[in-house]
Amino acid sequence: MGIFKEDLINFGNLIDTEVEVRLLPEDFKRVYPDLDFEFSDRLLRIKGKRKGLLFKRGFEFRGGQDEKRVYNVRGFETEDMGVYLPIISSEGVEELSRKEGMDTEGEHLKLSVFGVLKRSNIYRDIPDAFKDKLVITRYKVRDGYLSVYITVTK
């Protein structure tokens, strides 16, 4: 299901409607080129390389799914939205928290999906008047992709 410009014209009907946006590993690769994302049912693996003295060693972070744990930040110069992934394996958390768009909060990895969402075809089809009114309501880690559910706020 996608958002169409005709649907957005009727703004009142979209306020309570959730739209699923599927974000693929290739979409994440455009924003985080030095990381590999693997999605399986309720499990997200992020693979990367950490710098050593003479060589690079690989790491694999594993995060779970906390479906309702999302964040939406709206400000004068800042705009961000993302998900909180429960940390299953803490390997690589330090390296990931140094990257832009990722941070740790307690036992969760805070992962920004705004950059990935902005590069999606669905986001490009949304009229500019509604782009600043989008919020993430929940997410699901599925086999092969991350489902982000967005809605329009007043």
Regions of interest found by a model, annotated:
Residues 1-154:
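Extracellular/lumenal and peripheral-membrane lipid-interaction modules
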